[in-house]
Amino acid sequence: MFILTMGLNHHTAPIDIREKLVFKETEEEMALVTLQQEKSILENVIISTCNRTEIVAVVDQIHTGRYYLKRFMANWFQMDMEKIEPYLFFHEETEAVNHLYKVTAGLDSLVLGETQILGQVKHAFEIAKQTETTGTLLNKLFREVVTFAKKVHHHTKINENAVSVSYAAVEVAKKLYGSLDNKKIVLVGAGEMSELALQNLAGSGIADITIINRTKSNAELLANQFQAKVGAYENMNEHLMLADIVLVSTSATEPIIKQAAMQDLMEQKASSMLVIDIGLPRNVEHDCSYIPNFHLYDIDDLAGVVSANSLERQRIVLELENTIEVEVRNFFEWEKQLGVVPVIRALREKALDMQEVAMTSLENKLPGLTEREYIQIGKHMKSIINQMLKQPISELKEMSVEEDATTSIEHFKRIFGLSETDVTVIEKEQAETRS
């Protein structure tokens, strides 16, 4: 078993790519189940936010795991694998675990130290657990990672004066206008990002805030918390006509603010308008940025606003990286103690040895086989082996954390004819690899 992470984020892919590769909240469970059915995938969790789409998986082999993760992503989003591959990154084993710790603690965020990602990772894990696509390894890993991130935010100053994408949006408005006194603001959307924006706007001198949302009751709920007004969704353009600042963050999969409509609106509007689109996929058509006096910012444009973190933050990050390395080592020490990893690898090696013997016999008995035929038969035989071993391996992992784990593992080894020598050799190789 190996831990493998594949994904893309604000470091590796621009927003026009990221917005095409976002898992819809309504499809999360189906995506998890679909991925779990792929060959090589033993466990999986999908993390999908405005700045990243990442899959953390347990796979039986690294190279096949990489292929099937890429294939799943391409198939799910109906894109050619070659088109998305340049934007993907992979982390294996210690790098994968280290990366997850950093992501969850906010060290890999667009906004260093932001706390929103902790809730998003926790939510992703809970969905995967409910969907039963996690097992022994990922259950342990995500629990440890979430606990660590909570301690980080509680005991350090990494999230002091908490900054977020919503915070950055408000800072952009302040830079453009100076004082926000007497400015009229319209929020389109009533979700978490809008709520965070309202929290950051509190005390900024804005007295005229209107919230517009397709579901009016959600807008009313948020408006009551912040003494804001509610506007009718169908009258959005009328409210935009009067706005100085517009923050847009909805779950829409297509732009809801169109270039043609905004062109007409801005020709009639007497003043300029700042529009900050923090949705992903983007909620405002990119061509709106070419309209005179229509100042459009998206998530990637906000990066410069929040990149200048304090020296104190940077110092804390260095300290945390050292602490994370210790956490990662502890996790793999725990994994070794499971006792099943060497057993699984010994089982796989025994199966592959049997395949090699069978292929040699086949070559001797059918000397007329072409090289292409020989290779194809070998691939199909390996595929059968992988499929046959997938369920026993999953069951063994679960046995390893039961009360009678030692007895169960010994029975498993007996059933599959694994000797102590077979397992010991793998244990030594594993120790040398991680030392």
Curated annotation (Swiss-Prot):
Membrane listed as a keyword: no
Entry binding sites for substrate: 49-52, 109, 114-116, 120
Top-tier EC class: oxidoreductase
Site entry: Important for activity: 99
Pathway: Porphyrin-containing compound metabolism; protoporphyrin-IX biosynthesis; 5-aminolevulinate from L-glutamyl-tRNA(Glu): step 1/2
Positions of the catalytic residues: 50 (nucleophile)
Keywords assigned: NADP, Oxidoreductase, Porphyrin biosynthesis
Record-level Gene Ontology MF annotations: glutamyl-tRNA reductase activity; NADP binding
GO BP annotation list: protoporphyrinogen IX biosynthetic process
Catalytic reactions of this protein: (S)-4-amino-5-oxopentanoate + tRNA(Glu) + NADP(+) = L-glutamyl-tRNA(Glu) + NADPH + H(+)
CDD domains named among the record's database cross-references: NAD_bind_Glutamyl_tRNA_reduct
Residues that hold NADP(+) according to the record: 189-194
PANTHER family: GLUTAMYL-TRNA REDUCTASE 1, CHLOROPLASTIC
Domains: entry comment: Possesses an unusual extended V-shaped dimeric structure with each monomer consisting of three distinct domains arranged along a curved 'spinal' alpha-helix. The N-terminal catalytic domain specifically recognizes the glutamate moiety of the substrate. The second domain is the NADPH-binding domain, and the third C-terminal domain is responsible for dimerization.
SUBUNIT field: Homodimer.
Misc. remarks from the entry: During catalysis, the active site Cys acts as a nucleophile attacking the alpha-carbonyl group of tRNA-bound glutamate with the formation of a thioester intermediate between enzyme and glutamate, and the concomitant release of tRNA(Glu). The thioester intermediate is finally reduced by direct hydride transfer from NADPH, to form the product GSA.
Protein name according to UniProt: Glutamyl-tRNA reductase
